[in-house]
Amino acid sequence: HENFLGSYYERFSEIAQQNPHAWNQKVFTAEEIKTPSEKNQRIAYPYNKLHNSSWNVNQASALILCSEELADKLNVPTSKRVYPLVSSETNHMIAVAQRPHLTRPAGLYLATDFLLESAGSHQIKPSIFELYSCFPVAVQLFAEALNLPDATDKTITGGMPFAGGPLNNYMLHATAQMLESIRNKPSEIGLITGVSGLMTKQALAIWGKEPLMDFQSKDVTSEASRIDIPVAMSANNDGEGTVLGCTTLFEHNEAVKSIFYVEDSQGERKVLTSTDKDIFKNLGEQEWV
């Protein structure tokens, strides 16, 4: 998995090098990305600094969203106009430990299905993508929901670690650059994704050079809340359980604490922690989930 993530983000780095707006245009190899170092410190296994968003950046972006009537009055050239075609979102929030499926949020799939089905009914197929990249799992979950092959580029900017991820404003940056890309190549159909918090909320949008369909949008929160019902937390202090997810937190490249999400025999959840050095070592060498 570390090798996979290294190669995945090496490609992001290569794309950032070609982005004149990118914060960091240096190309990092897969080996540099996956290997902890003084400048690429491990944050939480298996993620290092270069896997995560660079939010301490000085960047700004803007776009003008208006009606065609106003655009005509302002004499905005048709060559500069790009149209939102369809969007979807979910705001159903559940604590990570209580999610029925840690890596398969119902809201994400409902929102994705609506987006692709709405576009598909008008023979609209996305050709370029900007998947939110605060950390690799965000990219991977969206790619899986969208059924994108590994070989398909997941970013046009270079992603948040390299292009820059200005805190909660990256979606505006991604959209502005997507519109630039579509202006430069009008045949492209762009798809952008976003998240909030710990993969808590998800949103998607498709843009095109021409108004190929009447704009559609849907909030699937209510539907998602009926499917993803929070799992109860366990009050048991001992017993057996199944590990659903785990990581080890690091400070200055030294392991400090392992964290486990566990489901007990009653189907309830528990969050466990350990500072045992043998567990630190074992968790990095064997699959616990």
Question: Which role fits each region the language model picked out?
Answer:
Residues 187:
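Active-site core segments that coordinate phosphate-bearing ligands/cofactors
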Residues 190-192:
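Cysteine-clustered segments with highest specificity for TGF-beta superfamily mature ligands
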Residues 1-57, 61-63, 68-70, 76-162, ...:
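Conserved "HGTGT" condensation-loop signature of ketosynthase/thiolase-family condensing enzymes
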Residues 177-183:
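Oxidoreductase and adenylate-handling cofactor-binding alpha/beta cores
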Residues 197-198:
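C-terminal substrate-binding/catalytic lobe of Rossmann-fold NAD(P)-dependent dehydrogenases
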Residues 167-171:
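A conserved active-site cap/scaffold subdomain adjacent to cofactor or substrate pockets
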Residues 174:
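Active-site glycine-rich loop that binds ribose-phosphate moieties when present
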